[in-house]
């Protein structure tokens, strides 16, 4: 029979390795707030960059940031629920909310991926020149820097709390660093070599990554 102290989805306390439960809870909440904030900032900046560059690869990473924001918001709600004290309906706490959030994240994916494939396919057969590439470079560098700072903080929080939700949130942000770097490469190929096909091809690759990440 499980008890409240053995729920693997609650912040755990191990001698010399885990923080006190209230301190761990505060760290977990702070990590979820940080991830949602970063995602929202990136959505705004990438949206502006997409409008100014008309690059479908930027559209793809914008969609990815929308998915990140949704997943991070789910994790925020799950962590808050998991940290609630036991009640009559939840005798052993609310810790099972964290794994459920991981399952719910997959619901964000398919429609966005289909939309991106359609947009990238149209651009592949009707290539366009990318404008204001300097804006695209600047936004992608900003995205990489913010994501790296977020990942460092999440790694610290996971080390202190062992949170399942924060671990899952960190996993897709790790891949986002590579995605953002690939967008920079795509912009460079289009602007310097005139390889207009590189933009939609990368967008299609990101669409595949988005679907793969859901499973």
Predicted features and spans:
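Alpha-helical transmembrane segments and adjacent TM-loop junctions that form the membrane-embedded core
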Residues: 2-40, 45, 52-215
